[in-house]
Amino acid sequence: MPFGCLTLGEKKDYNSPSEVTDKYDLGQVVKSEEFCEIFRAKDRNTLKMYTCKKFNKKDGRKVRKAAKNEIMILKMVKHHNILQLVDAFETKKEYFIFLELATGREVFDWILDQGYYSERDTSNVMRQVLEAVAYLHSLKIVHRNLKNLVYFNRLKHSKIVISDFQLAKLENGLIKDPCGTPEYLAPEVIGRQRYGRPVDCWAIGVIMYILLSGNPPFYDDGDEEDSDSRDKNLFLKILSGDYEFDSPYWDDISDSAKTLVASLMEVDQDQRLTAQEAIAHEWISGNAASDKNIKDGVCAQIEKNFAKAKWKKAVRVTTLMKRLRASEQGDTGASGLAAGATGGPPDPNMPGGSLLAASIKTALSEKAADAQTSTIPSLPQPPAARPEEQQQAQQQQQAQQQQQARCNGDVPQMLPQRKGY
């Protein structure tokens, strides 16, 4: 049965579980991810191996939505640097997605095994990623969770493929829900602005930064046990574009590479380089990438930074922001007063909480005031308040927000089109 749309009132025609098992032999679970379990599957007729993703409907609405979304997107795309959809089934209890099997290693692991690694190797990787993303963007598809790059097989000149389209979305001017992996998030996602295809270009800039230095562009040096403070500081650094090409890690990297990274990691999404523009950059399409061996320095930093990191795990950023809000309210008990610290009420749609909202505004105002330097803004500390004052302030703020919503009609604005998209 083709996995397609049903007409209004038509009875749902599910696949039977035997349709799946009669065609494919599912092996043991290879790994479990946020939304699904991953299997190696063998076609019983051709004996060809595939990757199978199984989504259990009982795991909730988000899982069901992720499965349907990935199927919809994968049915739209066909590109040699994108892992292709082979088959899809929906039973009463599960979704099954069968994909091409990528047997190669992740790019980070590949680098660690090389005897020689240079900017030209990175340029080759980034060119393939940019071509895939430019193709997606031509279809108005936003991936929203670019990070895991793998080689399709273990041959010497294997291609790079991207996958994991559970969070991908068609750009219609209304994307605002935050999701993805925190360290790869663009400023507009954290700031709860409406966003679109430029978020993928930011993530590509983060990936390129890591591949050239072995370090993440944004990190917090604070107490690793205080996860809320660490995440908050990470978000503030991303919002203000607070990263450096620090020595000695960037000493041997060409100016052309640094220029491309900076253009992809431009805080203003309207000024950020598009995927197609990045492909035309001299470091990608020309001969600007250096062939100097940078393997030792990059590998040392990759092993140091990513052995204990959580970067490979996608999280719902909404959940993270809510946790920060709960922590802040527990510390200050003054969510209604933080508005006074910034001259106005925080965005009612922003789940990051009062202090995070104030910090965002502080970070952005400092960035605008001093475009030449990137500093970590100090967090405003609202004064302590009595419980009755807190309750009164919260009630007043809620009433103002409700009145504003009635006056405005909550009509969303369309995302302005950028040249090149």
UniProtKB/Swiss-Prot annotation:
InterPro entries reported in the protein's UniProt record: Kinase-like_dom_sf, Prot_kinase_dom
Topology with respect to the bilayer: Peripheral membrane protein
Gene Ontology molecular function, alphabetical: ATP binding; calmodulin binding; protein kinase activity
Cofactor: Ca(2+)
Keywords: Calmodulin-binding, Cytoplasmic vesicle, Membrane
Main subcellular location: membrane
Pfam families, per the entry: Pkinase
Region (Disordered): 326-421
Residue stretches making up the Protein kinase domain: 24-284
The family this protein is said to belong to: Belongs to the protein kinase superfamily. CAMK Ser/Thr protein kinase family.
Function: Does not appear to have detectable kinase activity.
Subunit field text: Interacts with calmodulin, in the presence of calcium.
Name of the protein in its database record: CaM kinase-like vesicle-associated protein
